[in-house]
């Protein structure tokens, strides 16, 4: 019985730590860049896009396809960096224990 109560206490502590970490992730921002800086995307580590910046040279009808490709690339780069930031925080929380794939914050 004492083991069960100890586990419940640990679970409550972990839940509290995860909530605090989620709040931290809202304040961590990463930047994805493509086209050598022609397009950049900033997002939080919780995958919320904050800004998209586009070099004015890309804003014309002839460059629409290029701009679309660069946006996709910049978003993917920012997403990858946000995932990495989230994983670093998770490892700090779990003491390096591996969590099952897809178990994020």
UniProtKB/Swiss-Prot annotation:
Annotated Gene Ontology MF terms? Answer: DNA binding
UniProt keywords, alphabetically: Cytoplasm, DNA-binding
Q: Tell me the domain of life.
A: Bacteria
Q: Pfam families, alphabetically?
A: YbaB_DNA_bd
* Localization per Swiss-Prot or TrEMBL: Cytoplasm, Nucleoid
Q: Where does it primarily localize?
A: cytoplasm
Which cellular components does GO assign to this protein? bacterial nucleoid; cytosol
Answer yes or no on keyword Ribonucleoprotein: no
Q: Which family does it belong to?
A: Belongs to the YbaB/EbfC family.
Q: What does this protein do?
A: Binds to DNA and alters its conformation. May be involved in regulation of gene expression, nucleoid organization and DNA protection.
Which HAMAP family does the record associate with it? Answer: DNA_YbaB_EbfC (MF_00274)
Give the multimer and partner information.
Homodimer.
What protein name is recorded for this chain? Nucleoid-associated protein RPC_4847
The species this protein belongs to is: Rhodopseudomonas palustris (strain BisB18)
